[in-house]
A protein has these predicted regions:
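HotDog/MaoC-like acyl-thioester-processing domains
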Residues: 2-10, 21, 73-161, 212-219, ...
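Hot-dog-fold acyl-thioester-processing enzymes
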Residues: 2-72, 119-121, 126-206, 253-256
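Generic structural motif
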Residues: 90-92, 168, 208, 223-224
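A conserved acidic, glycine/proline-rich C-terminal tail/linker
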Residues: 196-224
Length: 256
């Protein structure tokens, strides 16, 4: 099994659901384009599931036209990799609220299994649909989602450190990775780390967190690497995202 240095700083908590409050589930299966050559589901594909079920939940609640949501941070903890064509129940629920943001938990549970193969938690920023500026949650949104975690207040503060003395490698974001917001979709930011994973044997498990900063456009970027940390930066040095590997996660081999 491969390993790499890991960080032991604070990661977003994986909060269990309460007995009350809204939960939303969809059946899902990893397809051909979701999986690595060995058959496991890739992290960028898992991130795609997270955003898809988040929107499906908002739409099902009748709130899709109230606001736009953009992801600020996501932690993905893989206990067992989902594999090609397996069937899963993907369940999501709100696990915390802030004034202009909310935290959403998602569990990916294989058919016939009791515990999740994957646990994830994301921080989403609440934006108005015209100017795309942060705005306070509406009474209707709080009524729909507040019951899941009415007393758990969360912060939108980012935690990952800035780069210092890191190795650098080129990366290219493509125009085909733009989404309807006209910037690189959040799932694509996982691809540089996934490319490292694909250089060797698949890790059995992983626990990794990404923070999104300045939205990226297509073009050449740099991926900085220092132990358990990765940073995706633009040509002018602006930071687009940072990645940290938690605990004792296996991962890519050290850079040669």
């Amino acid at each position: 099994m491969r390993s790499l240095p890991t960080v032991h700083t604070e990661f977003s908590e994986l909060v269990a659901p309460t007995k009350r409050g809204r939960r939303f589930m969809l059946p899902m299966r990893p397809g051909f384009s979701d999986c690595a050559p060995g058959g496991r589901m890739r992290l960028d594909a898992i991130a795609g599931w997270l955003q898809d079920i988040a929107y499906a939940d908002v739409e099902d609640a009748g709130l899709a036209q109230v606001a736009a949501w953009v992801v600020r941070r996501t932690r993905i903890r893989v206990h067992r990799w989902p594999r090609f064509s397996e069937r899963f129940a993907v369940t999501t629920y709100v696990s915390g609220l802030g004034r202009m943001w909310a935290e959403r938990r998602t569990d990916i549970v294989r058919d016939g299994a009791g515990a999740p193969d994957v646990e994830a938690v994301s921080l989403w920023i609440h934006l108005d649909r015209i100017e795309w500026h942060p705005t306070t949650l509406t009474d209707g949104e709080i009524a729909a989602y507040g019951g899941a975690a009415p007393e758990r207040r969360i912060s939108a503060r980012l935690r990952h450190p800035p780069p210092a003395g890191a190795e650098s490698a080129a990366w290219m974001f493509r125009a085909t990775e733009l989404d309807i917001a006209a910037h690189i979709n959040n799932a694509a930011y996982w691809q540089p780390f996934e490319q490292e994973l694909l250089t060797g044997d698949d890790p059995e498990q992983i626990d990794v967190e990404i923070e999104y900063r300045k939205p990226a456009l297509p073009g050449e970027k740099q991926v900085l690497r220092d132990g358990p940390h990765r940073w995706i930066v633009g040509e002018g040095g602006e930071m687009h995202a940072s990645i940290a590997v938690a605990g004792d996660s296996p991962g890519p081999p050290p850079a040669s």
